[in-house]
């Protein structure tokens, strides 16, 4: 009988890596996608991984322990709907349509799974016509989400991986811990692109004074801070990092040049 239990996130990543290696002529055999798939699943391979089951078990337990998160668990919705009308025409809808329907500015997050399903039914009712049939995919994930990868710093081997919080419903699903899932890095990017090169190559120190004041990009677009339309005056680079001051970061990047910042990001190994 066919095993319908979803693979773990670690096995998902391992599977993807093996297929990639089999198709890479410099690493594996230069197989086609079909050849690689057949070799993996039908070729009788013995596969040995770097996973440490004890570490993996700890990661699974900790990441899925609700007591490690805010008391009020919310649920994020990912949604896809295909409506087949009575005349055979099809219309496709996604999470974005539900956001518009509910006038939700930031994201589809609900206080309970039941609330999410109620909104879905209300949306479907708003577009329904006689004779419709529906094909939908509903994914609800507890929020906030999290992921973890444990690497042996001595060998570089991956010992454990969890790609998301909550019950895994399918194999090869979104893996937040794997390189295929990119995310906007936020203000931590200021350190890599701006302050690191300023400290390393431009003679700056953490005590360097940067003035938080009205400032514009070269095209005249004003730069704003996350805390609102006011300014905090002189602050050290250390304080600017602590406060995540946007204007200070832009002024520093302009001073060292974006080209230098870009070079440092490349040297740090960033490629996405």
Predicted regions and their residues:
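A short, well-structured edge-of-sheet supersecondary motif
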Residues: 79-91, 140-170
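Primarily short, surface-exposed interaction patches in extracytoplasmic proteins
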Residues: 262, 266-272
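Non-catalytic, structured segments within soluble enzyme domains
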Residues: 1-65, 74-91, 271
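Soluble non-cytosolic domains of exported or imported proteins
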Residues: 4-13, 49-57, 168-169, 183-189, ...
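Active-site SXXK
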Residues: 59, 155-156, 183-210, 240
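Short active-site loop at a secondary-structure junction
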Residues: 141-147, 169-192, 207-210
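Conserved catalytic neighborhood of penicillin-recognizing serine enzymes
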Residues: 2-4, 203-261
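Intrinsically disordered, low-complexity acidic Ser/Thr-rich regulatory segments
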Residues: 34-36, 111-149
């Amino acid at each position: 009988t066919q095993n319908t239990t979803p693979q773990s996130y670690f096995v998902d990543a391992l599977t993807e890596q093996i297929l990639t290696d089999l198709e890479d002529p410099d690493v594996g055999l230069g197989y086609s996608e079909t050849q690689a798939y057949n070799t993996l699943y039908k070729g009788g391979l013995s596969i040995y991984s770097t996973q440490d089951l004890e570490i993996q078990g700890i990661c699974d337990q900790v990441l899925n322990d609700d007591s490690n998160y805010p008391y009020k668990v919310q649920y994020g919705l990912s949604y896809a709907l295909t409506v087949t009308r009575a005349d055979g025409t099809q219309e496709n809808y996604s999470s974005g349509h539900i956001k518009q329907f509910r006038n939700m500015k930031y994201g589809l997050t609900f206080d309970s799974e039941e609330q999410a399903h109620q909104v879905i039914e209300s949306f479907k009712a708003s577009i329904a016509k006689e004779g419709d049939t529906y094909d939908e995919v509903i994914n609800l994930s507890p929020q906030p989400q999290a992921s973890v990868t444990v690497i042996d710093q001595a060998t570089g081997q991956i010992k454990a991986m969890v790609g998301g919080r909550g019950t895994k419903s399918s194999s090869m699903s979104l893996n937040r811990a794997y390189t295929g899932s990119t995310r906007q890095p936020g203000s931590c990017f200021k350190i890599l692109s701006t302050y690191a090169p300023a400290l390393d190559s431009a003679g700056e120190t953490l005590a360097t004074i940067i003035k938080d004041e009205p400032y514009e990009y070269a095209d005249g677009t004003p730069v704003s801070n996350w805390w609102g339309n006011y300014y905090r005056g002189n602050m050290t680079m250390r304080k600017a990092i602590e406060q995540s001051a946007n204007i200070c970061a832009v002024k520093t990047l302009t001073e060292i040049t974006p080209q230098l910042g870009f070079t440092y990001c490349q040297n740090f190994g960033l490629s996405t």
